[in-house]
């Protein structure tokens, strides 16, 4: 057990944070008062009310389950969030996980709580997901009256409302159609795959078939409106750099990294993130030098690289001191944008390296065009009569998780 604890402590140190605003100001330009005000605003936004019922209390016909990992809204929720995360075998496998997971969660809680305090006391991801869902279903009712009324549901893996709780609410509402809509544009077995597995497990464990017809939007890395949103936010942020420096700004597209052991099993995530980056740069006319980098590496084992912080250091050493960070795999702000990118990299690391200007492109958050993208994705999906993407039907060539096969069978067997 001691050896297992030491091993897990190394593998899971410091940055395994999953949770979802503003762009960072140039280095050393934001005052302490401004930082405190921003943190207070983030805390207020994080403690948002639950999603409202369908307007007019009309019985919903089509439900859209918005899938994500979620994030603690208060520091008091951090330990439960971490415990669920460390117990998720779709995300990671540990020795004696039922004992080791809670142990690590308890040990990590104080440090992670302090990081959430630094961003205002909680994650705003639920608030942003609610706003995005509201905008999406409003547009859907206009775009697709024959599948209306539409209602969105939030299904988080590690905080309330949990995926299982959302499914129970959907069953009570008596829906005809249910769309499992991942909020990760790029598919990974550890994110979207874990959420889809949770849907299969729910029905398998309760021992009954769904009363509604399920399908899933399991990836959307190159949707035109998603690409337009990213391009718009990049252009907006580039305008804040000094005019004489603008063309030499290095754009660093930062995505959550993955262990190479997962990648080598055939997880499609790296290719799909790369596809998003290429489409965005094509939209921008390749106006600036750019790289795809990876953040949040944990432990000594090989992960996708280069790491975001190492890339920043390397560029600075080579005289490239104007950098724009773009969170390309996150659509809403959370701990990895607000703390890791905005504080660890844009404040602490930037000061250590001597960067001239570093900014972070705003997350998609409440952008109306992003709500339009979500509505268009669901509308097109409902019209297509597809159960899932063709890619979802293909298991990773070296898959080691038998639940994945059962989940794929669950969705492909639905009679729409």
UniProtKB/Swiss-Prot annotation:
Keyword Transferase in record: no
Residues the entry annotates as binding protoporphyrin IX: 108, 116, 123
Protein name: Ferrochelatase, mitochondrial
Annotated localization: Mitochondrion inner membrane
Residues binding [2Fe-2S] cluster, per UniProt: 189, 396, 399, 404
GO biological process: heme biosynthetic process
Topology in membrane: Peripheral membrane protein
Main location per the UniProt record: mitochondrion
Residue range of the transit peptide in the UniProt record, numbered on this chain: 1-47
EC numbers on record: 4.98.1.1
Active site positions, chain numbering: 223, 376
Principal EC category: lyase
Pfam family, one: Ferrochelatase
InterPro entries assigned: Ferrochelatase, Ferrochelatase_AS, Ferrochelatase_C, Ferrochelatase_N
Cofactor names: [2Fe-2S] cluster
GO cellular component: mitochondrial inner membrane; mitochondrion
Segments of this protein annotated with the region Disordered: 41-62
């Amino acid at each position: 057990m001691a050896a297992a604890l030491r091993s897990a402590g190394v593998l899971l140190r410091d940055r395994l944070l999953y949770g979802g605003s503003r762009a960072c100001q140039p280095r050393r330009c934001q005052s302490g008062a401004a930082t405190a005000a921003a943190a207070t605003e983030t805390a207020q936004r994080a403690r948002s009310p639950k999603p409202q019922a369908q307007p007019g209390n009309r019985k919903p016909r089509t439900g859209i389950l918005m899938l994500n990992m979620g994030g603690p809204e208060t520091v008091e929720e951090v330990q439960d969030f971490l415990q669920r995360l460390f117990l998720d075998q779709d995300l990671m496998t540990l020795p004696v996980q039922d004992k080791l997971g809670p142990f690590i969660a308890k040990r990590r809680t104080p440090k992670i709580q302090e990081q959430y305090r630094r961003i205002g006391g909680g994650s705003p991801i639920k608030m942003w997901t609610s706003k995005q869902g509201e905008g999406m279903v409003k547009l859907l009712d206009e775009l697709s009256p024959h599948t209306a009324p539409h209602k969105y549901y939030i299904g988080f893996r590690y905080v309330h409302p949990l995926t299982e709780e959302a499914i129970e609410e959907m069953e009570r509402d008596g829906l005809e159609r249910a769309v499992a809509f991942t909020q990760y544009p790029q598919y990974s077995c550890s994110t979207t795959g874990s959420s889809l597995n949770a849907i299969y497990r729910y029905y398998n464990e309760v021992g009954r078939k769904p009363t509604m017809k399920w399908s899933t939007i399991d990836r959307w890395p190159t949707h035109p409106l998603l690409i337009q949103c990213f391009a718009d936010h990049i252009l907006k942020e580039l305008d804040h750099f000094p005019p004489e420096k603008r063309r030499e700004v290095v754009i660093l597209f930062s995505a959550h990294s993955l262990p190479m052991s997962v990648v080598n099993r055939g997880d499609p995530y790296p290719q799909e993130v790369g596809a998003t980056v290429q489409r965005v740069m094509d939209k921008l006319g390749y106006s600036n030098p750019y790289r795809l980098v990876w953040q949040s590496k944990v432990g000594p084992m090989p992960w996708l690289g280069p790491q975001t912080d190492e890339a920043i250091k390397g560029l600075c050493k080579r005289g490239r001191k104007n950098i724009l960070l773009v969170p390309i795999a996150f659509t809403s702000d959370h701990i990895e944008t607000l703390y890791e990118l905005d504080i660890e990299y844009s404040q602490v690391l930037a000061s250590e390296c001597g960067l001239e200007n570093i900014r972070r492109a705003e997350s998609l958050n409440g952008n109306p065009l992003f709500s339009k993208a979500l509505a268009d994705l669901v509308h097109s999906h409902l019209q297509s009569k597809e159960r899932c993407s063709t890619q979802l039907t293909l298991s990773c060539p070296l898959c080691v998780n038998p639940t994945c096969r059962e989940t794929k069978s669950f969705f492909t067997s639905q009679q729409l």
